Amino acid sequence: MSERIQKLLAAAGAGSRRGIEEWLRDGRLKVNGQLVKLGDRAEPGDRFELDGQVLDTGGPAAGEAPLVTAVLLYHKPTGEVTTRRDPQGRPTVFEFLPPAPSGRWVVVGRLDVNTSGLLVFTNDGGLAHRLMHPSFEVERRYLVRVRGAPGPELAERLRRGIQLEDGPARFDRIEPQGRSEGHSWYQVTLSEGRNREVRRLFEAEGHEVSRLKRLAYGPFELPEGLTPGKSWVVPGLELEKLLAGLKTAPNLR
């Protein structure tokens, strides 16, 4: 299933989405030997070139045996970015990962620099696509802290849905988790991954998010005891069981 080029390459860690959009505007990118422009789409298995140099997007090189799928869970602390390189010199999550058993790690569903919690990595581009594309409706679960003491009507409005600048948005589930020291806590679930969507939903209702932590992504949960900055490779048999529950076909409603 095709995806916008900047989204595919950003997910593979080739650069920031904004930076990749600049490459497209400047005519520096080719896909399968053809020059592409902003707005064009590509498949995860396509060949990408920047200024004539092939970009490594995590798949096997020509002639190599197919990859054995691996998944790594990382507890991202705040302050780290999810690109391979950062022009501002900030630490990137890739600096703290062990080598992939084959191929290289691709991040599934980025987190912004001020968000902590679960990051999923895989060396399988097809699996990454299934986990990220909205048509597969993979749930993401977060713990959110907002300033103040919103009334119960806030949860109801965000469950029904509101209009953001890039279209309607809503939480599939939103559950109050109590209050402490001038803040209110919620656990929220949604099945798409638009840029800063959790923060923007609350901000659209006048409530600033002061802390955001991802707890789960699809079948993967942040392991108990996995401290910030640490990672864990899911064992093969456990991974097989977890992936068995994934949708194998997109919802095309």
Where are the regions a protein language model picked out?
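Basic, flexible Lys/Arg- and Gly-enriched helix-loop patches that mediate nucleic-acid binding at interfaces
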Residues: 1-253
